[in-house]
Amino acid sequence: MRSPVGNTYETIAFIACMGVLCALVVELFSKKGIVLAAGLLLGAFSCQMGILYESSQAVDHMDPLVAILRSNFLLSTHVITIVLGYAAGLLAAVLSHIYLLASPLRLIGGKTEQSLDRMAYGILCFSLVFTLVGTVFGGIWGNESWGRFWGWDPKENGALMIVLWQLTVLHARKAGWLSSWPVSYTHLTLPTTPYV
């Protein structure tokens, strides 16, 4: 059995699918329509990024994975969990961008603004849980595969950076430093996630 996320191209496609799926689940509860727009933007942007990446780099293929990456339940769980967390984080970032663009133009207000705030906050909490659990699974897998839980390589550092940033945003919100802005500073997460 092979994990559906074995290379960069597959990761981008998986993020697009999971981001849209997260948007659909949130839309079932909110029924505001704005989350569908955010999911559409995330899906379209991710697909476009995948097309551009594949056409410019053309380095990813559906080649068989190296032995250490094959048939490892913990690795598959780690990768799927952390990429789901990244997709949810990107969805929260897109919602925050919508808020930051629409609020000053008075396109949204009142209950829609509060609803958008709650949705971005909830999605960011969901993202944090999956990103944190995925990072820990990655450490456990690394310890079993290479004998070290944490090696400070770029992917590990990137995952840690995303977890710490999400924790910072959520704690700042809880402390009242972000008060009426929805977790609007999650938009800074957007540039960091694709590079992990």
List PLM regions with ranges.
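Hydrophobic cores of alpha-helical transmembrane segments in multi-pass integral membrane proteins
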Residues: 1-61, 77-104, 116-145, 154-188
